[in-house]
Amino acid sequence: EHLALAHGAQATAMYAVTTALLRYPMAMAAGADMAPMLAQVDAERVEAARALFARSVDRQRMGWREVSGQPLLDVATQALYHDLLVLGQRATDDTRDVDVPPDFVSAVIIGSGRPTLVVPHIAKAPTKLDRVLVAWKPTPESARAVTGALPLLRQASQVTVVAFDEGDVAATEAGIVGYLQQHGVQAGFRREVALAHDVGTQLLSLAADEQSDLLVMGCYGHGRAREWALGGVSRTVIDSMTLPVLMSH
């Protein structure tokens, strides 16, 4: 809501979950009399979500949309009609969250291709995104993430671009810093040597050292059939982030 207000944007909250019938398919084997009970579970959960929404936001400033059944497809599809998607990080040890698939966040990012702001579950999101770290690679994923983040970058007081072992450093710096400058963003640049064991952890540590409020990066992954596989850096950041991350595939 605060982000939308800062940019004069319209925000919509979306309730998208797997139905109780799909979450507990074995219940139907017990008999048709389970159907009303499962429907009641769904009704109670959506009512709780509506109440939370009403308590948490100004309903004059934020819309509300409900879908159920296929949360991955529903959210990825609706993201196509919005400039930015905001998702909450899922705790890797949270066994209670059965409303969406375990790979919900990564699958929606990859499946929609839209800029997505992922908010960490262990920290309160800052009210202002003043200090931004951009993890740059000369790839379509990075380019889309930077383009999607431009409205936020223009309002930031400090933007730092970091590149890890990207060949011709001078050309890389001139390219990305020049692009940002053309869009009204003054950015610093630094090159880091990638550590072999885990660039994702290295990137998050750098964000902490820089006291960054936001990390911008491409999301790397591929899909086969209905399963999505994330690249190592993307998975580490999604699993271990402690600051908001704007990603795009």
Question: Model segments located where?
Answer:
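Active-site phosphate/pyrophosphate- and oxyanion-stabilizing loops and adjacent acidic/basic residues
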Residues: 1, 106, 147, 204, ...
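Short secondary-structure boundary segments
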Residues: 15, 89-90, 218-220, 249
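A short acidic, glycine-rich active-site loop
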Residues: 33-48
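Small/aliphatic-rich secondary-structure junction motif
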Residues: 1-33, 111, 124, 128-193, ...
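Intrinsically disordered or low-complexity boundary/linker segments at protein termini
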Residues: 75-77, 83-163, 240-249
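Structural beta-alpha unit
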Residues: 12, 18-21, 54-85, 183-215, ...
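P-loop/Walker A phosphate-binding loop and immediately adjacent motor/lid segment at beta-alpha junctions
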Residues: 47, 51-59, 95-120, 181-190
